[in-house]
């Protein structure tokens, strides 16, 4: 009965393990470790557990089922029936029966291999390390053995083998725990070979010694024992890392209790932390809660007001001061008013504290008023310490502002008075109207203040009294004049010495001055006055091309050709209107080359006799003008003011932008030029003026053509040349009085600009310009050569040089 119950409880795999007789073990403990397989291959070698299956099976698996019970009963009956046989025969029979039963079973080869690998475990160590299951099975095995001994007569031998059985069961219990899960079954081939060939114990010992040392097997046995215990530990580790419900619930509970790590939860925790502190501070939990809330609500607006005050940007003294000079100065006043209103909303306690602390600080409005009353003075410490009276400084500022306003208001009347007196139609430079360019920013007026030069288009203006061109770009039409009037102008045109407050002599042409001196027959030509030929050389390229298109020609790229074509067209157009008095065959006013002069001389060959008579009249008129007294000049000036007061006159430096160089001492500034004018006037005995007008003389004022070159100078001319000023100074004045180039790209700079830019001056070109146009600006009839121009350039430190192909011929 006990055996059946044991089989039901402890059998985990009954198909693999069969029960054997427990009473008669065939081998002792000494033979358990000496068995070896017959074949050389380790796969067919049986293990010690195969040889001693009855004790090992009784230790790990309880004998269960009817098979084991029937085998026991049969064995007991055979033992009772064959008492005559000796102990050896009974043991052989039991071994044969056990072998037959083992053949029907299937054992895995892995089990035999693992047991063969570890055949010699340290038995004394396992005695102390046996598990509870092993001890329980040991007790049951002892009970079964005692029952068998009671039933059998010769159970003394069983007692002898009990200690060996217990030792083997301990060893096999340890090995079965490892190999039971690995080996699915045993093969019966090992037992068949073992019965045929025997055990071969000595050979097995050699193989076992060569196979594994004893020390290593002992350590491996300990490791196997530990692995059996580590099974549960590894399972516990997996339970910690596994997704078990209990572990997940515990983790979620701990997280919920501590608070989730999200930002929203943290913000909620921070918000809910304040009421806890307020509850701690409140003395009564229920009665004073309403009072605490009311006090919080009352303190909340005050705290908000404080925070707003702190967050507001502090206005500094520098900001207050500079705000007065900006356009949005009223914004600061509004900000001050808002600050006052915000301060009124604060509670009385806060106001009292602030007043006690800041009693010496003014209110924002009073501070702004105080700043407005102050006078800001900019200067060094020494400059500010000179005057201590604030009223004097305030009066000084008022006077400065008044003087500026008066200068702006009186600018136009002064220009009209100067125009009436024949000095300036405008000031030398005007105030800033619009910012133009770098040169105008660097320009300065007579007082030394920065100003912008007012530039007029002097394209078609030959007389001082004529109006400037219209703003729409149209060229002004001249009033028709008689050729005889032009001749009279040439006879009587001489600069008049006029000194203003600055002592500047200006060349003023008197159109009606010759009427009192000319003969009555010359006035008859005034009715047939024609317009003089305009100065095409002073026109812009765009105006020249437009005028050429008006005459029906195609636009030309060469500027000189356009000027020649326009001159011929103009002469052909106005030749029919002439009444017998031809134009003077002098140098053309456009500044063209000698070719243009020859063209004009060829057109006027028919009137060569008339030209000679006109020349004689001009010489006589010049002598008469020089002999006149100053009273006659004053009468002429009074007669001229009536005419010139109605028209704007051109100043000497009006349309020239002064390009001054700090190191250029050769070319004088306007103020230096004025002093030179005074000096030359005082030195000259003949009272010959030094004209500074930028407008050239009339065409009849100079006779420097091929026809005039043949004539010999008269004694009167030689007498006047001795009293003329230095020719070098005349060249300097002519260079400074040359009009600026009006081209946009400045491809045609003036001689003055070339000198300032240190461009090399070609002496031949410079001498040609002086003889044709330059000296005519200063009313100089003398001519200069290239060698004289070279001396003038070298004396003034100007870079100059001859042309390569014409230097030898010039010398």
Swiss-Prot record:
Compositional bias (Basic and acidic residues) at which positions? 281-291, 611-642
In terms of Pfam families, this protein maps to: Slx4 (PF09494)
Per UniProt, subcellular location reads as: Nucleus
Polar residues composition bias: residue spans: 107-116, 599-609, 712-723
Biased-composition ranges for Low complexity?
Answer: 38-49, 689-704
Q: What is the primary gene name for this protein?
A: slx4
Family membership = Belongs to the SLX4 family.
- Keyword Phosphoprotein in record: yes
Q: How does it assemble?
A: Forms a heterodimer with slx1.
An annotated GO cellular component: Slx1-Slx4 complex
> Where does this protein have compositionally biased stretches of type Basic residues?
90-103
**In terms of one coarse class, where is the protein primarily found?**
nucleus
Recorded hits in InterPro entries, A to Z, give: Slx4_ascomycetes (IPR027784), Structure-sp_endonuc_su_Slx4 (IPR018574)
Q: Where is this region: Disordered?
A: 38-193, 266-312, 464-498, 579-649, 680-726
What does UniProt give as the signal peptide span? none
Please give the function described in this protein's UniProt entry: Regulatory subunit of the slx1-slx4 structure-specific endonuclease that resolves DNA secondary structures generated during DNA repair and recombination. Has endonuclease activity towards branched DNA substrates, introducing single-strand cuts in duplex DNA close to junctions with ss-DNA.
**One of the protein's GO biological processes:** DNA repair
Q: Name one GO molecular function term.
A: 5'-flap endonuclease activity
Briefly state the modifications made to the protein after translation. Phosphorylated in response to DNA damage.
Q: What organism does the UniProt record list as the source?
A: Aspergillus fumigatus (strain ATCC MYA-4609 / CBS 101355 / FGSC A1100 / Af293)
Q: Which domain of life is it from?
A: Eukaryota
Q: What protein am I looking at?
A: Structure-specific endonuclease subunit slx4
Keyword set, alphabetical order: DNA damage, DNA recombination, DNA repair, Nucleus, Phosphoprotein
């Amino acid at each position: 009965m006990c055996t059946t119950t044991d089989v039901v409880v402890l059998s985990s795999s009954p198909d693999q393990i069969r029960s054997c007789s427990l009473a008669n073990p065939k081998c002792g403990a000494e033979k358990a470790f000496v068995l070896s397989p017959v074949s050389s291959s380790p796969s067919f070698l049986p293990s010690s557990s195969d040889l001693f299956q009855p004790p090992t099976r009784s230790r790990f698996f309880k004998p269960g089922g009817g098979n084991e019970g029937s085998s026991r009963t049969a064995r007991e009956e055979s033992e009772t029936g064959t008492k005559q046989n000796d102990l050896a025969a009974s043991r052989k029979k039991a071994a044969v029966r056990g072998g037959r039963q083992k053949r029907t079973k299937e054992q895995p080869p892995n089990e035999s291999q693992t047991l063969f690998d570890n055949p010699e475990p340290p038995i004394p160590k396992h005695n102390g390390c046996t598990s509870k299951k092993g001890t329980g099975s040991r007790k049951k095995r002892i009970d079964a053995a005692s029952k068998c001994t009671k039933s059998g007569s010769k159970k003394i031998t069983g007692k002898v083998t009990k200690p060996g059985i217990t030792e083997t069961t301990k060893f096999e219990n340890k090995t079965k725990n490892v190999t039971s899960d690995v080996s699915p079954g045993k093969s019966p081939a090992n037992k068949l070979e073992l019965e045929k060939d025997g055990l071969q114990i000595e050979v097995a010992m050699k193989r076992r010694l060569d196979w594994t040392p004893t020390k290593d097997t002992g350590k491996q046995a300990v490791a196997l024992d530990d692995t059996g215990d580590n099974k549960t530990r590894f399972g516990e580790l997996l339970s910690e890392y596994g997704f078990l419900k209990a572990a997940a619930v515990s983790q979620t509970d701990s997280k919920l209790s501590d608070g989730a790590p999200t930002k929203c939860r943290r913000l909620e925790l921070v918000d809910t932390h304040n009421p806890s502190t307020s509850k701690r501070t409140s003395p009564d939990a229920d009665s004073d809660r309403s009072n605490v809330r009311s006090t919080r609500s009352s303190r909340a607006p005050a705290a908000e007001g404080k925070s707003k005050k702190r967050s507001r940007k502090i206005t500094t003294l520098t900001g207050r001061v500079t705000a007065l000079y900006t356009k949005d100065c009223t914004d600061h006043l509004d900000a001050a008013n808002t600050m006052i209103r915000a301060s009124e909303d604060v509670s009385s306690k806060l106001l009292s504290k602030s007043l006690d602390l800041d009693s010496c600080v003014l209110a924002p409005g009073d501070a702004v008023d105080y700043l407005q009353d102050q006078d800001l003075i900019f200067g060094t410490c020494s400059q500010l310490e000179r005057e201590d009276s604030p009223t004097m400084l305030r009066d000084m500022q008022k006077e400065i502002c008044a003087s500026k306003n008066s200068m702006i208001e009186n600018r136009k009347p002064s220009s009209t008075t100067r125009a009436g007196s024949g000095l300036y139609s405008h000031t030398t430079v005007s105030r800033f109207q619009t910012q133009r360019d770098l040169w105008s920013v660097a320009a300065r007026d007579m007082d030394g203040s920065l100003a912008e030069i007012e530039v007029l288009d002097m394209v078609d203006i030959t007389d001082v009294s004529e109006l400037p061109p219209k703003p729409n770009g149209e060229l002004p039409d001249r009033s028709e004049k008689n050729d005889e009037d032009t001749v009279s102008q040439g006879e009587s045109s001489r600069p008049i010495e006029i000194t203003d407050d600055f002592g500047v002599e200006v060349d003023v042409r008197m159109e009606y001055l010759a009427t009192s001196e000319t003969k009555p027959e010359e006035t008859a030509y005034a009715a047939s006055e024609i317009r003089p030929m305009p100065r095409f050389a002073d026109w812009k390229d765009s105006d020249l091309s437009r005028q050429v298109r008006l005459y029906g020609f195609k636009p030309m790229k060469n500027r000189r050709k356009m000027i020649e074509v326009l001159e011929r067209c103009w002469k052909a157009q106005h030749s029919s209107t002439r009444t017998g008095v031809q134009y003077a065959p002098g140098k053309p006013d456009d500044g063209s080359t000698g070719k243009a002069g020859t063209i004009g001389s060829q057109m006027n060959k028919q009137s060569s006799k008339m030209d000679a008579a006109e020349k004689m009249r001009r010489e006589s008129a010049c002598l008469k003008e020089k002999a006149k007294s100053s009273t006659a000049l004053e009468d002429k000036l009074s007669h001229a003011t009536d005419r010139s007061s109605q028209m704007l006159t051109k100043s000497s430096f009006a349309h020239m932008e002064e390009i001054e160089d700090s190191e250029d001492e050769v070319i004088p500034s306007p103020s230096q030029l004025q002093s030179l004018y005074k000096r030359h006037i005082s030195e000259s005995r003949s009272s010959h003026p030094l004209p500074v007008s930028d407008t050239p003389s009339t065409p009849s004022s100079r006779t420097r053509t091929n026809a005039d070159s043949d004539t010999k100078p008269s004694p009167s001319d030689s007498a006047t040349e001795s009293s003329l000023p230095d020719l070098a100074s005349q060249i300097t004045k002519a260079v400074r009085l040359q009009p600026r180039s009006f081209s946009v790209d400045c491809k045609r700079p003036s001689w003055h600009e070339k000198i300032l830019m240190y461009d090399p001056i070609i002496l031949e070109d410079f001498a040609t310009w002086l003889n044709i146009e330059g000296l005519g600006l200063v009313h100089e009839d003398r001519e200069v050569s290239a060698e004289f121009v070279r001396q003038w350039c070298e004396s003034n430190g100007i870079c100059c040089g001859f042309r390569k192909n014409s230097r030898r011929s010039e010398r």
